[in-house]
Every structure is written in structure tokens, then in C-alpha cells.
């Protein structure tokens, strides 16, 4: 079956989320508030949940805390881009991601009035207030909008809707697809209505999953044909990493794959294009100074985006 037919089947089998209309309106308003020359980065982040039941108790989830997407969104904002941040609910978010640990550890009892019995601990005040001030500045000035999702179905419906609305800015759109998207799903008609029972007499659970259509193809060909599109490839086996990235480029014909290994993803990545492979490694000194590799990834993404914008500007 052709990929386009598979895509249509997926959206027919998986009804759109009730919030799709509201999300679409928010994105349209956000785009309309930008200047005619403003570049927009569409950053996706976090994992996607695949339910095993209609009334979901059990599910399959993809590994991702969302730090790469959240950090990258920050660096895009600081580089002058406006950012649409599509993130997994409860995953890390731009600016507020900087504190790691239970949020209750941020506070202590105040010795002041009973109207404000809790205050931010002295050692966290700078981090907390700076993060909140930056987040407030970018959202208040319409430079950052954040849209949450949970399931694979929500993610794909939102991806399609946002991509179609970004068509209006053509090559000024940059897609930075850092979300960990499931390769497999279970169609709703094949889901158990209620919780799968463990005491049914069987000593095993067999789950039949179907491949998710390759929606990157539709981004490139149909949903956002003039945008710059960057995808990520995460593997655990270094012997296949670059080959898998090259296969993705050949299959989908987008601009860049950022390839990384699970064990070294925070300090090493490869920028893979149709012609080159360029490795980036943080030094030991970078690690000590807590330099984030995402600032270099975003810088490379912006350079690529500028080149593509210039190519379209020169086109007859």
C-alpha cells in the first residue's frame, strides 16, 4: 500500500483529539503575531505513549525525558527565533528544566507573615527567578508557545496541523524533530476495551503492533515542502548509526539527520547530510563547565536553515 494511503488510513482509524481545533487556532494566532521576516523553529520533544487498551491502564512508552528538545528550544529563542514547542506532557520544558529534583525541595518555611508561609530557598532563588523571568519574557512577547501532547495519535495530529499552518511562512520554517516517536502502534479497533487481565490463565501476553506510517515523507513532500527539516536518529549500536542516518536521508530527502548513541548522546553527535558526516564532541573541559551540546546543535541547524532560505530567495 502506498505511504499516502497508509497516512490517510491512520488518520481515519485514529480520531483527532478534541483539542485539535483549539491548538490549530492558537498556532494560527501565534504565526499571525510574527513579523514578515521572523523565522520560526518548530521543536518537538519527549516520548510518545502507545495505549494497549481503550480505557488505558497499560501502555508502551518511548524513552525520552525531553531535555534535548527543551534545551534546544531555549537556544533557538536566544538566537532570535520564535519557537513552537510541541512537548510530551510532564516532560522537561524550556527554562524551567534547569532544576533537577522534586520541586518541593525548592521551598522552605518563612519566618514572616502567615500569608506567605513558604519561600524559595536562598540557594535556588537565582536559578528559579531567572528561569521564570526568561520564560515570561519569551511567552509574553509571542516568541514561544508550548503545546502539550501525550499519545502517539495526539502527536501526529498536532504535527500535521502545525505543519500545514506553517506553510504560510514557507522557507522561514525550521522543523527540529527531537521527539522520540514510536515506530509501532495498535489501531483502536484492535485494542481491548478494558484493562488486560493478568489472571486469565495464560502465562504470556502477546501484542500485535502495526508500523506507524513514515510521516517524515509527508512533511517533506506535502505538509511543509519549503521548510528546512531536521530529524534525529538514536541508536545503541555504533556500527549501524551512520548508515541508518544515511538511509533516512535517502528515503525522505530532507536536509539533516543528527545521529547519536544512547550512551554518549550528551557529549557526541554526528551531523549527517547527503554529502558529509561531521562529528561534534564536547571536550572534558566543556563537560566540567557544564556546556550543553544543544547550543552547538542549534547553531548548526540555524546555519543550515539560513543557507536554505538563501537558496529559495535565489530561485526564479
Swiss-Prot record:
GO MF entries? phosphopantothenate--cysteine ligase activity
Localization per Swiss-Prot or TrEMBL: Cytoplasm; Nucleus
Q: Does the keyword Ion transport apply?
A: no
Pfam families xrefs: DFP (PF04127)
UniProt-listed InterPro entries? CoaB-like_sf (IPR035929), DNA/pantothenate-metab_flavo_C (IPR007085)
- Give the GO biological process terms: acetyl-CoA biosynthetic process from pantothenate; coenzyme A biosynthetic process
* Keywords associated with the record: Cytoplasm, Nucleus
- Give any Gene Ontology cellular component: nucleus
> Could you tell me the superkingdom of the organism this chain comes from?
Eukaryota
Q: Keyword check for Magnesium, yes or no.
A: no
Its chief place of residence is cytoplasm
| PANTHER family named among the record's database cross-references | CORNICHON-RELATED
| Family according to the record | Belongs to the PPC synthetase family.
**Entry protein name:** Uncharacterized protein C4B3.18
Amino acid at each position: 500500500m502506498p505511504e499516502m494511503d497508509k497516512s490517510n488510513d491512520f488518520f481515519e482509524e485514529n480520531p483527532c483529539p478534541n483539542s485539535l481545533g483549539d491548538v490549530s487556532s492558537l498556532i494560527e494566532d501565534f504565526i499571525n503575531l510574527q513579523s514578515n521576516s521572523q523565522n520560526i523553529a518548530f521543536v518537538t520533544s519527549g516520548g510518545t505513549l502507545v495505549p494497549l487498551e481503550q480505557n488505558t491502564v497499560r501502555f508502551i512508552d518511548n524513552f525520552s525525558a525531553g531535555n534535548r528538545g527543551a534545551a534546544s528550544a531555549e537556544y533557538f529563542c536566544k538566537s532570535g527565533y520564535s519557537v513552537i514547542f510541541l512537548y510530551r506532557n510532564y516532560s522537561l520544558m524550556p527554562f524551567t528544566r534547569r532544576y533537577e529534583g522534586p520541586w518541593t525541595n525548592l521551598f522552605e518555611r518563612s519566618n514572616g507573615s502567615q500569608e506567605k508561609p513558604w519561600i524559595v530557598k536562598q540557594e535556588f532563588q537565582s536559578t528559579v527567578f531567572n528561569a521564570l523571568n526568561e520564560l515570561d519574557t519569551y511567552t509574553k512577547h509571542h516568541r514561544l508557545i508550548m503545546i502539550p501532547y501525550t499519545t502517539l495519535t495526539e502527536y501526529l495530529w498536532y504535527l500535521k496541523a502545525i505543519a500545514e499552518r506553517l506553510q504560510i511562512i514557507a522557507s522561514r520554517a525550521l522543523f527540529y524533530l527531537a521527539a522520540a516517536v514510536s515506530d509501532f502502534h495498535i489501531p483502536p479497533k484492535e485494542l481491548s476495551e478494558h484493562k488486560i487481565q493478568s489472571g486469565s490463565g495464560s502465562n504470556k501476553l502477546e501484542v500485535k503492533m502495526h508500523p506507524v506510517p513514515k510521516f517524515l515523507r509527508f512533511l517533506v513532500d506535502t505538509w511543509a515542502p519549503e521548510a528546512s527539516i531536521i530529524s534525529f536518529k538514536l541508536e545503541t549500536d555504533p556500527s549501524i548509526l551512520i548508515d541508518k542516518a544515511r538511509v533516512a536521508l535517502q528515503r525522505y530527502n530532507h536536509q539533516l539527520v543528527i545521529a547519536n548513541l544512547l550512551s554518549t548522546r550528551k557529549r557526541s553527535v554526528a551531523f549527517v547530510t547527503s554529502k558529509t558526516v561531521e562529528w561534534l564532541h564536547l571536550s572534558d573541559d566543556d563537560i566540567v563547565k557544564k556546556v550543553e551540546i544543544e547550543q552547538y546543535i542549534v547553531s548548526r541547524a540555524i546555519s543550515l536553515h539560513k543557507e536554505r532560505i538563501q537558496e529559495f530567495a535565489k530561485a526564479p
